[in-house]
Design a protein with these regions (language model features):
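Short, surface-exposed amphipathic charged segments that create phosphate/polyanion-binding patches used
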Residues: 9-14, 94, 113-114
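Extended, subdomain-level signal for the structured scaffold at the beginning of enzyme domains
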Residues: 1-58, 66-70, 100, 128, ...
């Protein structure tokens, strides 16, 4: 396998094969990448992603949206990314209609999410699309999630901000 160093050197992944060797028919493809993804310019990867664009669902978690944008797959489409990187995405790829607030966005068969936890919300939406709301709730329960969040919910939580303010006033 191919060794892939995780962000910050904390995790190492072993890939079974290089993306260019992956073939076959896929129903759904979900990209989950690290922060370095924002500067990736790889023609072979862009070509492979264009081949994958015909799947029923193509998704990108957090900064993986940059890979879809680089491949031209987000041109004219609505998309999101983590709140820290939305402006950068919009500046680098002005043809993408970047939405800065939602947790995740669906535009046609392409889904983008704001961050890792928003990626969980997106994955649960896919489970609901395929298997119904009951199984999606069961999966959320197994993951010990406090609640399931719809895609249109804001990235920056008012509840979290209130909680942080309350904690600061206690100290």
């Amino acid at each position: 396998g191919l060794t892939v160093e995780g962000e910050g050197g904390v995790l190492t992944f072993i890939a079974r094969q290089h993306f260019s060797k992956v073939e076959g028919a896929f129903d759904s493809v979900l990209l989950v990448c690290g922060l370095g993804t924002r500067s990736v310019r790889d023609a072979a990867l862009s070509a492979w992603l264009k081949k994958m664009a015909g799947v029923r669902r193509l998704g990108a978690v957090c900064v993986s949206s940059f890979l879809l944008a680089e491949a031209g797959l987000l041109n004219g489409r609505r998309a999101t990314a983590h709140w820290k990187f939305g402006r950068e995405l919009a500046k680098q790829y002005p043809e993408v209609r970047v939405e800065h607030d939602p947790l995740w966005v669906k535009d046609g068969n392409i889904y983008t999410s704001a961050g890792l936890s928003a990626g969980i919300d997106l994955a649960l939406a896919w489970v609901e699309e395929d298997c119904g709301v009951g199984l999606a709730h069961e999966a959320a329960r197994e993951l010990v999630l406090f609640l399931r969040r719809p895609g249109g919910q804001p990235q920056l939580s008012v509840s979290l901000a209130s909680q942080a303010s309350a904690m600061m006033s206690i100290r």
